[in-house]
Amino acid sequence: MNVTARSDMPSLILPGGESIPRLGLGTWRMGEARSTRAQEVAVLRHAFAAGITLIDTAEMYGEGGAEEVLGEALRGSGVVRERLFIVSKVYPWNASREGTVAACERA
């Protein structure tokens, strides 16, 4: 799936010239229960199909479960990962330079 942001989606131009959508989908509460995983994957894939290219997640959402759901939604979806903006956050105890890099690599 070749995901592109909708042309009518409000966007913000970053200093590097990239256009990032002002509207995205948050994944808080995703990945907390196996019983809702299929529905969560479906929601993310529906968002991709609707042109949503900004996904917000964090290592503390479902203790990493939200990131796993996002990964599952991407696998087999045909979405080109490089077309997405994935915004994440780290635990305060991982907020050092090294901790942040390590948290991103785990994601």
Model-derived regions: residue spans:
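Conserved donor sugar-nucleotide recognition element shared by glycan-biosynthetic enzymes
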Residues: A66, S96, T100
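CE4/NodB-like, metal-dependent polysaccharide N-deacetylase domain
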Residues: T100-A107
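A short, charged, and often flexible helix/loop element on the N-terminal side
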Residues: E32-A33, P92-R97
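A short, structured active-site edge motif that brings together acidic residues
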Residues: E82-N94
